[in-house]
């Protein structure tokens, strides 16, 4: 998507590669020519995220199927240029497209980037994740699956209201970040 090209080109101009050194524990070497004067800004995350935040791989895989089918685009400009829906995970016509893409993923146990990820994602795990995503969509009416202490229980765009609900099984205690609070 052309809108993403400048940021991608800037990234690729300094990115040299990465290497997985171990999986248990996960240790990854990252090679780049870019650096910051403040050392803490030189640490990169390998967590999959996009402009709207973190996302589980199975949500992105479903959206990618919609993009590959020529029904969705990740940016407004690409959606307008191609006459397709913007990939809105919360509301609108894209939900039907995402739902259809999810059905395809469920039928095929789709594993994205198969040559690499088959080592880490089994067909059984893929099937389980897609089934969980189907249940999430049935319960909440959207595909915005979070990874934090809250989940989007409802979204009402006309009213500009989002309802967030505590996710009690979130593994981090609320006190984990207390050390960041100035006293």
Give the residues covered by each predicted segment.
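Surface-exposed binding/hinge segments that line
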Residues: 2-125, 147-149, 156-161, 165
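Glycine-rich loops and low-complexity Gly/Arg-rich segments
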Residues: 55-56, 176-178
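Polar/charged alpha-helical tracts
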Residues: 119, 124-132, 178
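C-terminal substrate/ligand-recognition segments
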Residues: 130-177, 183
